[in-house]
Amino acid sequence: DASLLLWRGVEMVEILSTLSMDIDTLRAALLFPLADANVVSEDVLRESVGKSVVNLIHGVRDMAAIRQLKATHTDSVSSEQVDNVRRMLLAMVDDFRCVVIKLAERIAHLREVKDAPEDERVLAAKECTNIYAPLANRLGIGQLKWELEDYCFRYLHPTEYKRIAKLLHERRLDREHYIEEFVGHLRAEMKAEGVKAEVYG
């Protein structure tokens, strides 16, 4: 469905918009799902958005070849093998922006498989744990690394993830309650001293 592919492109642009990427990168991200599914031809893209955007889309597509390697989605693999795959990925592309678009595409995919069967979620999470989260870390893109790791942990360790999420929620409620009490006490003290001021938590 072209509309779903376009929606994925919009989501990728939204992910990248926080990184202050240039307009060609955002255009390539928006159009990549449509181009990858051959919904829009390369000739049409070249005429409408130019060669630079098409080259970026090519670079992202080339990175898909890495998925054929067992090291991308298995547990029984050494850190050296995984590191080799990451180096291969970086060597495959001439433009750093291709890697950033690919990271956004993987995040969009992780979001999409939230309600998919468990084996599909686990497969996507293993691939990102082995390859893409460390790649984001190596490139210094902490924002994307954090979201990749968050989804991976949620899918690979769901019970532990729910436990931690519950603890964080309880701590937030405790903190809000403490602030509310403190602000109330401060307002009362200021009123008693005749001080007119607004206090917010």
Predicted regions and their residues:
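Active-site helical microenvironments for divalent-metal-assisted chemistry
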Residues: 1-201
